From Swiss-Prot:
Annotated GO biological process: proton motive force-driven plasma membrane ATP synthesis
NCBIfam families the record matches: PRK02228.1
Protein name: A-type ATP synthase subunit F
Keywords, ordered alphabetically: ATP synthesis, Cell membrane, Hydrogen ion transport, Ion transport, Membrane, Transport
Source organism of the structure: Methanocella arvoryzae (strain DSM 22066 / NBRC 105507 / MRE50)
GO cellular component labels: plasma membrane
InterPro entries for this protein: ATPase_V1-cplx_f_g_su, ATPase_V1-cplx_fsu_bac/arc, ATPase_V1_fsu_sf
Pfam families: ATP-synt_F (PF01990)
Family statement: Belongs to the V-ATPase F subunit family.
GO molecular function terms listed in the Swiss-Prot or TrEMBL record: ATP binding; proton-transporting ATP synthase activity, rotational mechanism; proton-transporting ATPase activity, rotational mechanism
UniProt cross-references to SUPFAM superfamilies, sorted A to Z: AtpF-like (SSF159468)
Name of encoding gene: atpF
Compartments (UniProt record): Cell membrane
């Protein structure tokens, strides 16, 4: 399983420098949704990282798919810790890492 990062250039560049190969730069909300949908069909992806601010620009239908997705698991970073992250990790691997 691989990790993918989707977002604006300034967000994905750090991940690219850290060795993540599947980084996808998007220019606008339409590109963001398109790339997320493309990532959902890639069976090699286990985790997809997004910036939390980008989630505000995603359609409600795709937001629901992201929220309910176990594989790949979506991780939104860039803001305060979200209790949803804990639940997603627990669903994905079956273990509560915070205990």
């Amino acid at each position: 399983m691989e990790i993918a990062v989707v977002g604006k250039s300034e967000f994905v560049v750090g991940f690219r420098l850290a060795g993540i190969h599947k980084t996808y730069e998007v220019k606008n909300d339409k590109d963001l949704e398109s790339k997320i949908r493309e990532c959902l069909t890639d069976r090699n992806l286990g985790i997809i990282v997004l910036h939390s601010d980008d989630l505000k620009h995603i359609s409600p239908g795709l937001q629901k798919v992201i929220d309910e997705s176990v594989e790949p698991t979506f991780i939104a970073i860039g803001s305060k810790e979200d209790a949803g992250l804990r639940d997603k990790i627990k669903r994905a691997i079956g273990v509560d890492l915070w205990k």
